[in-house]
Amino acid sequence: MQKPQYIDRITKKKVIEPIFYEKTMLFLYNSKLGKKLSVFLSTHPIFSRIYGWLQRCSWTRRQIRPFMNRYKISEKELTKPVADFTSFNDFFTRKLKPEARPIVGGKEVFITPVDGRYLVYPNVSEFDKFIVKSKAFSLPKLLGDHELTKLYAHGSIVFARLAPFDYHRFHFPCDCLPQKTRCVNGALFSVHPLAVKDNFILFCENKRTVTVLETEQFGNVLYLEVGAMNVGSIVQTFSPNQTYAKGDEKGFFAFGGSTVILLFLPNAIRFDNDLLKNSRMGFETRCLMGQSLGRSQREEI
């Protein structure tokens, strides 16, 4: 079976994505028994809570150094020495030095809010044209709000998928006034490409949070964090109804893989050309937090 590939934004080369717990993932999503087991585990949150508790135990510290070596995670980016982490989950939710993720300036520039693999689509209503095998993607089901669905039905959408070895804090992508976050309860299906490749509706069924960002340059932007298998915890560290600057921390995911989804009103943003090109070819683009995602179309009117 062909392994997932993405395009690295810096090198512009295709990269074969390493599969976290490869044998387990292949069993869960490429066998009949595995698929049934994955549904059972994902719809019973007790398993995710137990797994999360285990990753908070002090003995998991021994996993950190081998994990960093395997996935080439730089210790120089960390705000504290590896020896100071109290558990694997403590390392998983690590903070980085500001210089490790420089922020692109300009109020008209919307930045990538997380380290992850990005897909961008200028029009939500055309989304199915790009997803060949996927089960139906449902915006009403994703948002759980009829009024928001009407507003964003012809807007733009971004998927940013995080792998377990990525930096797992998420940030504000522009200057904004965030409203109170709303939680939409759901299961915790994996968002690994092996799981999602034929089933984008998983994003509409997983536990997720929705925050409206009031912005001057981009109108109201919807910012969603989607939980995944072994990620029962989406932690918001911001205070609603207070202004935040581009690049400020919004929150973090506890252990596992996860996804951020952004929704824009029609004609609010023009995505960068490389992201558009790669998405149209069916390739995710690996970006680092703080890079340019697109520009406000208000500047062009």
From Swiss-Prot:
Under Enzyme Commission nomenclature, its number is: 4.1.1.65
Modified positions (Pyruvic acid (Ser)) are: S258
Q: How does it sit in the membrane?
A: Peripheral membrane protein
Q: PTM per UniProt?
A: Is synthesized initially as an inactive proenzyme. Formation of the active enzyme involves a self-maturation process in which the active site pyruvoyl group is generated from an internal serine residue via an autocatalytic post-translational modification. Two non-identical subunits are generated from the proenzyme in this reaction, and the pyruvate is formed at the N-terminus of the alpha chain, which is derived from the carboxyl end of the proenzyme.
> InterPro entries this protein is in?
PS_Dcarbxylase, PSD-B, PSD_type2_pro
Function, as annotated, reads: Catalyzes the formation of phosphatidylethanolamine (PtdEtn) from phosphatidylserine (PtdSer).
Protein name per its UniProtKB record: Phosphatidylserine decarboxylase proenzyme
Species per Swiss-Prot/TrEMBL record: Chlamydia pneumoniae
